[in-house]
Curated annotation (Swiss-Prot):
Source species of the chain: Ovis aries (Sheep)
Lineage of source species: Eukaryota, Metazoa, Chordata, Craniata, Vertebrata
Subcellular location, principal: secreted
SUPFAM superfamilies named among the record's database cross-references: Defensin-like
Family per similarity comment: Belongs to the beta-defensin family.
Name assigned to this protein: Beta-defensin 1
Length: 64
């Protein structure tokens, strides 16, 4: 019975840790950690948007 409880707890820990990867980039530090750069307008053609840096006007862009 203890094994079932341990596996259940481990399952929830794995699920809660994975939820952060679905949220995207929302600040400058996490943008740079994801190998991106902050651009005040649209991303250049050779880059794609992966999030925002300081709100909607500033985009976080990374090479395609």
């Amino acid at each position: 019975m203890r094994l079932h409880h341990l596996l259940l707890v481990l399952f929830f820990v794995v699920l809660s840790a994975g939820s952060g990867f679905t949220q995207g980039v929302r600040n400058r530090l996490s943008c740079h950690r994801n190998k991106g750069v902050c651009v005040p307008s649209r991303c250049p053609r050779h880059m794609r948007q992966i999030g925002t840096c300081r709100g909607p006007p500033v985009k976080c862009c990374r090479k395609k």
